[in-house]
């Protein structure tokens, strides 16, 4: 079903305004914006509430690192790969030609070696799809799709964590918040969707917990998006998210697993924690010298400066 752009625009415009510079004390005023939450903003808060405050509330600039530059360029290249891949053309090729074809769809730049790793992976995936007569599932049904939705976060109570001495907390009321995100890819296998996240850094086993939170955020986003938003991104409302996946080509690591409700619960709890920080107007630091030393806000963070001089 093709969505008319004016219908999609009207759907988005009908949602409440949203912002990171949110004031919970004004929530009852219908003219005031609600809280905007993305996978990145929630991940930053989980990593360090103070960094979230610097980046999203105060909107202080960050230095662009080589990792950021690489991520942007390689994400664009992978998006273009799927836009340009011709199933009918590839079906007539030999295995060697399929690899050459996949390689040819990537640009020539500083990351050619990384692209070749991806080309090998994608060529083998297509060869396997050919053998199983599943080339119709090779391309993603959604390639860099934008999703928006509104969800209600109950007042609680919520279990606390190490961040607040494991004390339970409650919000002052239920809140509607706006979730937004761009999902790299969504594939369909059988009767289920599989969101897949593309990462350009190196895989470490400790990252699995964070990846599950990221993918659970996307599942919540898809599950709560309207039919128009889903169809605009290429998805059908009656097909559920059955699995999620992530791909780290630099480490030749790919993982796919059944989606887990407990990870969604963890994300919802983190959103409640974020709202609680806004209510308390308190965004505490999580100082750890090995990671904080690379933070763009190291020079203005009181916790970092105090620890440095100890």
Residues covered by each model-derived region:
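Accessory/regulatory regions of helicases
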Residues: 1-23, 292-293, 297-300, 306-308
């Amino acid at each position: 079903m093709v969505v008319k752009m004016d219908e999609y625009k009207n759907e988005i415009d009908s949602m409440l305004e949203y912002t990171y510079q949110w004031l919970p004390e004004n929530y009852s005023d219908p003219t005031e914006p609600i809280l905007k939450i993305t996978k990145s903003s929630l991940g930053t808060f989980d990593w360090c509430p103070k960094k979230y405050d610097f980046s999203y509330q105060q909107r202080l600039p960050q230095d662009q690192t080589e990792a950021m530059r690489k991520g942007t360029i390689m994400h664009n290249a992978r998006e273009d790969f799927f836009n340009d891949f011709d199933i009918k053309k590839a079906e007539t090729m030999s295995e060697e030609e399929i690899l050459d074809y996949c390689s040819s769809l990537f640009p020539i730049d500083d990351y050619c070696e990384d692209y070749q790793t991806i080309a090998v992976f994608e060529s083998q995936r297509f060869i396997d799809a050919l053998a199983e007569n599943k080339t119709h599932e090779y391309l993603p049904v959604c390639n860099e799709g934008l999703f928006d939705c509104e969800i209600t976060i109950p007042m609680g109570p919520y279990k606390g964590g190490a961040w607040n001495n494991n004390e339970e907390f409650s919000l002052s009321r239920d809140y509607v918040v706006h979730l937004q995100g761009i999902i790299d890819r969504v594939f369909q296998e059988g009767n289920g969707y599989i969101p897949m996240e593309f990462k350009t850094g190196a895989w470490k086993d400790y990252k699995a917990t964070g990846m599950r939170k990221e993918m659970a955020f996307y599942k919540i986003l898809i599950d709560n998006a309207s039919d128009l938003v889903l169809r605009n991104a290429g998805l059908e409302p009656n097909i559920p998210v059955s699995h999620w996946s992530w791909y780290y080509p630099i480490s030749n690591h790919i993982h796919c697993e059944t989606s887990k409700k407990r990870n969604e619960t963890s994300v919802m709890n983190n959103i409640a924690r974020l709202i609680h920080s806004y209510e308390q107007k308190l965004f505490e630091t999580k100082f750890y010298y090995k990671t904080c030393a690379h933070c763009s806000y190291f020079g203005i963070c009181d916790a970092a400066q105090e620890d440095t001089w100890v």
